[in-house]
From Swiss-Prot:
Maturation propeptide residues: 23-44
GO-annotated biological processes: defense response
UniProt gene name: psn-10
Span list, region Disordered: 25-44
Signal found in the keyword field: yes
Tissue: Expressed by the skin glands.
Signal peptide region: 1-22
Native organism: Pithecopus hypochondrialis (Orange-legged leaf frog)
Compartment annotation: Secreted
Function as written in the Swiss-Prot or TrEMBL entry: Has antimicrobial activity.
Protein name: Phylloseptin-H8
One Gene Ontology cellular component annotation held by this UniProt entry: extracellular region
InterPro entries recorded: Frog_antimicrobial_propeptide, FSAP
Coiled-coil stretches noted in the UniProt entry, renumbered to this chain: none
Length: 66
């Protein structure tokens, strides 16, 4: 009976450790995805902030040529 008890505790312990590792990896993956989304948004904001100056430069170039 003691052997079964020890085996059961061992199985439960290993299952708990495995579950903990999986949750940690999932959390890290979610953090990386969130960081990537934030980087994409900041790049988009930078591009949109440059857009008016690019348009005004193109308009002035067209006026000089036309």
């Amino acid at each position: 009976m003691a052997f079964l008890k020890k085996s059961l505790f061992l199985v439960l312990f290993l299952g708990l450790v495995s579950l903990s590792i999986c949750e940690e990896e999932k959390r890290e993956t979610e953090e990386e995805e969130n960081d990537q989304e934030e980087d994409d948004k900041s790049e988009e904001k930078r591009f949109l902030s440059l857009l008016p100056s690019l348009v005004s430069g193109a308009v002035s170039l067209v006026k000089k040529l036309g």
